[in-house]
């Protein structure tokens, strides 16, 4: 019978001893004779904690949407009944007045249908550009060659209405049949199509920031400043949307404004603007500018930051091959202009 070997007695050893081998718990190593194997225990605090999947929240009835839909339906019914009664009263008074009222009602209905159609087209166009941006970002990560060709074709359709991009479209179309990786194709499309648009967008943002800084520096009332900044911001967002292929109407502008504000909230744009203003105005520039000009510079920088966020939102391709415009460059131009005006 085989006798059991006695258990190993406690002993001391050095970790740098070549006869001591430290292995993980799941490793199986073939050790030589006289070699000591040490398997360290894992600290429970450092072990990964399994995260349970969050169950999707149960969505109830959209009472807010139902309320506004019902209110809009009742309003349309009331307006329709009022128009019908008005036309009936006009016919009762005079047949000619009835036909005139009927013609006005027809023109109003036709104009309303055109406005609704334009709003729907603008919303659909904005949704197309937004999805194109997301698809391009996915191709940059996955390098999908087939999907990149589809994105380039969709991008060429959007850019077809811009005569300034005729040469860029021809150059890009000549490369669509070549063997190019998906991510490289997206970068090529960005360099060819977005480069002139980015330069024009930077000019629009710089011009809007300078106008805001000048008007707010000379305006006598704070209410005028707020109103002008708001109008200038809306106009800038609309110009950038048209530049990059969007056609927003009233509802489209509301949607764009929400996206721009959300982008600023995510990226901390206002905080970045404040820190930049404090940094640049704290290096002796504040002493050179008067109080009103300093307020104008601040409003101009905030407008510029809003414009940069609008570029990110309205641009159909993410920044990959081209560097995004920086607030520091626009701030340098704005401050230099203000110094010249002060002198």
From Swiss-Prot:
Coiled-coil intervals, chain numbering: none
Source species, domain of life: Bacteria
InterPro entries registered for this protein in UniProt: DUF697 (IPR021147), UPF0283 (IPR006507)
Topological category with respect to the lipid bilayer: Multi-pass membrane protein
Keyword Transmembrane: yes
Keyword Transferase in annotation: no
Pfam families: DUF697
Cellular component GO terms, alphabetical: plasma membrane
Subcellular location, record wording: Cell inner membrane
Spans through the membrane: 64-84, 97-117, 214-234
Keyword terms of this UniProt record: Cell inner membrane, Cell membrane, Membrane, Transmembrane, Transmembrane helix
Family: Belongs to the UPF0283 family.
Protein name stated in the entry: UPF0283 membrane protein blr7254
Organism from which the protein derives: Bradyrhizobium diazoefficiens (strain JCM 10833 / BCRC 13528 / IAM 13628 / NBRC 14792 / USDA 110)
């Amino acid at each position: 019978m085989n006798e059991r070997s006695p258990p190993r007695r406690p002993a001391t050893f050095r970790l740098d001893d070549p006869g001591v081998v430290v292995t993980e718990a799941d490793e199986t190593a073939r050790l030589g004779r006289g070699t000591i194997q040490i398997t360290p225990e894992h600290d429970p605090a450092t072990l990964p904690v399994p995260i349970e999947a969050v169950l999707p929240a149960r969505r109830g009835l959209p009472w807010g949407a139902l309320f506004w839909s019902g209110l809009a339906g009742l309003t349309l019914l009331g307006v329709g009944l009022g128009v019908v009664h008005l036309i009936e009263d006009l016919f009762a008074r005079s047949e000619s007045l009835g036909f005139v009222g009927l013609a006005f009602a027809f023109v109003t209905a036709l104009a309303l249908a055109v406005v609704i159609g334009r709003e729907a087209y603008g919303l659909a166009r904005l949704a197309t550009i937004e999805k194109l941006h997301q698809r391009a970002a996915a191709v940059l990560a996955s390098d999908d060659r087939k999907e990149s060709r589809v994105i380039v074709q969709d991008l060429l359709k959007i850019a077809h209405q811009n005569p300034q991009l005729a040469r860029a479209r021809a150059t890009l179309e000549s490369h669509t049949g070549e063997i190019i990786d998906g991510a490289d194709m997206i970068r090529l499309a960005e360099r060819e199509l977005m480069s002139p648009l980015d330069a024009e967008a930077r000019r629009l943002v710089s011009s809007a920031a300078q106008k805001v800084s000048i008007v707010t520096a000379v305006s006598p009332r704070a209410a005028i400043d707020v109103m002008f900044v708001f109008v200038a911001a809306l106009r800038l967002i609309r110009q950038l949307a048209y530049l990059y292929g969007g056609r927003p109407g009233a509802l489209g502008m509301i949607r764009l404004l929400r996206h721009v504000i959300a982008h600023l909230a995510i990226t901390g744009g206002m905080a970045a603007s404040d820190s930049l203003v404090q940094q640049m105005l704290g290096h002796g520039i504040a002493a050179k500018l008067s109080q009103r000009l300093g307020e104008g510079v601040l409003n101009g920088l905030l407008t510029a930051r809003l414009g940069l966020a609008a570029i990110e939102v309205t641009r159909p391709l993410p920044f990959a091959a081209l560097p995004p415009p920086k607030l520091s460059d626009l701030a340098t131009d704005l401050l230099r202009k203000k110094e010249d005006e002060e002198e």
